[in-house]
Amino acid sequence: MKVKELLDVLNLKLLTKDVSEDALYAEVEGGYASDLLSNAMGQAQPGMVWVTMQGHQNVAAVASLIGLSCVLVAGDGPVAEETLHKANMNDIVVAATDEPAFELIGKMYALGVGKK
């Protein structure tokens, strides 16, 4: 599944408006959920979707460092403008939803994200 398809199917709001087509059509390789950046750095893998409630600028840095396909901010968590600026500069898709992380992750799993 491609990032854009995931955003469309789950009706997620794209926050990074200046990302490339390559970023939007990157393959989703799996998923990871955590609000601790250190856990994401140690356990998330390139190509994964990261579900978090964090919206500060270090989220974009970690996503870029790992090579994540996108960051999904759940639970109507606030996302700082600095975060979006860094994400756009690093071609990282950031999207948001007011749905709780648990429900979002369940829907992603039902779509096949993370299934081997």
Regions inferred by a protein language model and the residue ranges of each:
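N-terminal, charge-rich interaction modules
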Residues: 1-21, 25
